[in-house]
């Protein structure tokens, strides 16, 4: 391929034309005909378990960025992963993902701030995707409903159905295209239509509706009949406000992803899902939950009697085909409570009492505890399998019980705490619990007024990722950096959204022999940040690979020491201010003198 391209005209038009017609070139050009055969052999050389995982990728559209977490949890639900030699199903599936990356069968998509896993997302190269689609169809594994797809005959025992955003068929076409009684997964990428769920789908295990438009509350009632479901994603379905009680019948459910919905309360019946391992929620609405659960019930009666006929006439703002129940849910669970309690945190969910019954939970978040009783927090303490917990709504009434709860979760690896009261510092919570955090904690996120970092944070020898921000108001930049610089395992550091008290002259300095393991540094919207300096007279951040600087209402005056960072690969500078030619010129000069030849990416714009 390289030799062929080297002999082509070096013009943008020619290369663009080749890129658009690469499949045809591979078929017609004798010089390139060997490439597909090589790629096919790379597929055929995969072990059986990786072949299944690779063919599964044909579900996703062209050039689609596929989340590692999404893939891993779907593979688990499909039975592609199992516990092996003491490794959990998630660890095994993660290993499969990395094996496909290492074999270059799938391509990594790197984000500015990676997770503990290193690679968060992947893509399929167009040529590998063609192989995946072809083989998956040959084996009746995956069928894609898309514009131009043939539905003239019923497909035999198709396992996975993907509905593309450009498919405009009707119910008759849908039911004639696939034998619904055999499908194990349904993935919708476009607009939701009610006939996508059928009582014939008796063995459906995976229902992935991430980003689907037109899905409203009353559609969820039909999903409750699919009792073999193990994975449900409603992520970014932002017209969903409430889960029905009937979802308590989904006793096989392992993963429930509600991030980006407007759900604020979980029904009591959720505690029947004793196999649930992953519960994700982070809303996108104003404060929308009641303090004791009584207000929405009373408002529902009022709304049903008086308001619905009028409101339903004005429901054009809701996507899909909302009925009176959807509109009433919106007003009674969102609008009225929001007006009553404007100061509540706009994100997170309220979990029901008896959440302790969900003993299999590994991941729980984002939980809003602003008005949770002590018994609710004690319930969370009994979730002894928890590896990841995210909590918001911390205030002076609940912080002591929260500290006690976290202390009791000995297996916790990731913790996020968001404080919502400006009248009291998160400092009080952390000062009162010097042994608060499990020693094997790997990821910690602290949002709220801190004033200073406690000395005990230096005892977190296993901490790999740390994020501090949202009005943390740390008073001493140097003291903060000295404490953090001593963490031996810290690889990812994010300081964001006013982590320091605004002084107008903030200078962040990375001293010699500090941050021995730091690989990713993200400084985001630190108002008053004037300079970032890496001391050149010694080993400073010797493993740093990625530096991201993001700012809005200010300009950096100086960035220095980049030429001495031995492993630096990439510097990203972005924000909504004009480029400072002097600073950018200095950065380019420093990077040109860095022996590792790091890449500079600049994305500055003005509103």
Predicted regions and their residues:
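Conserved hydrophobic beta-strand positions in leucine-rich repeat
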Residues: 161, 186, 207-210, 229-235, ...
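A structural signal for short secondary-structure junctions
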Residues: 408-409, 436-439, 447-448, 458-461, ...
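Beta-propeller domains
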Residues: 435-478
